[in-house]
């Protein structure tokens, strides 16, 4: 079974792209075959690259968050993915790393845009809703883009100027002996821009707090614990930054009749001892609604399991369904009428005579006492 990509890189499912890249660079340096002789280095390096290849791409990541490794099975079957023996050059991997942390000899103008935070929402649904799929309306509060300044943070018609203290870089440099240190610009607070007349509604942030309503589509066959990612539905970014994402975690309520086992459903089916002995048909409820007939074989024993094929849960992106397994519970009556007792006494006599006439049974009993 493939390991979870987030676990491979050691990051959370809400990690930012910067966190994912940082974790990848650290692990790639540790396990690159050119830098270590560890026996499992090549295998680990392949896993790290496969995980990063998916998580660095927003579309691939969204598909992985929703469907897991199944989203890429067809690609792997065609030979896709980074499963060969090719190793990216160690210098290529860390080229950006060293330019980011050591400096490239010239200063780049930084952007004041900040990505919005991701949000998490816990949604509980019924088993029937998980089977059929459903559209749910959810309500939550978050930071939204200011509709007065359109996210600029400035009053309408006012201009935003480049910070004259740092030249729009967002940081100033201090020379200390042989070393040059950078610190956040005290004038623009690292934004690189100065808003002379901030928007009164959002106080210059380009966003404000608001209660939101959103329609969430739950696919048929969703499982308990599934996380659905809605790209761009998290908190609004600051000063034009990208929105964060919304993660909806699905929990399915325990059902009164069914227990879920993957795509299969289990239920306890009580039947009379007459049905168990003689057999017959009995109607049982099914998850899609209504009832179907189940054949009870004559001589069914307590604890027997009878299967109704394709009457279990639906599966995401599939027409195949699981099965429903009924666990037989034979009920013995506690109170009998006079006629019922007489009939059972007669049945008892017949049963004893049958056993005595059964030579194999009689011989077994005789051998025990001889």
UniProtKB/Swiss-Prot annotation:
CDD domains: DnaJ, DnaJ_C, DnaJ_zf. Keywords: Chaperone, Cytoplasm, DNA replication, Metal-binding, Repeat, Stress response, Zinc, Zinc-finger. One of its GO terms (biological process) is DNA replication. Binds 2 Zn(2+) ions per monomer. Residues 4-68 form the J domain. The J domain is necessary and sufficient to stimulate DnaK ATPase activity. Zinc center 1 plays an important role in the autonomous, DnaK-independent chaperone activity of DnaJ. Zinc center 2 is essential for interaction with DnaK and for DnaJ activity. This is Chaperone protein DnaJ. It comes from Rickettsia prowazekii (strain Madrid E).
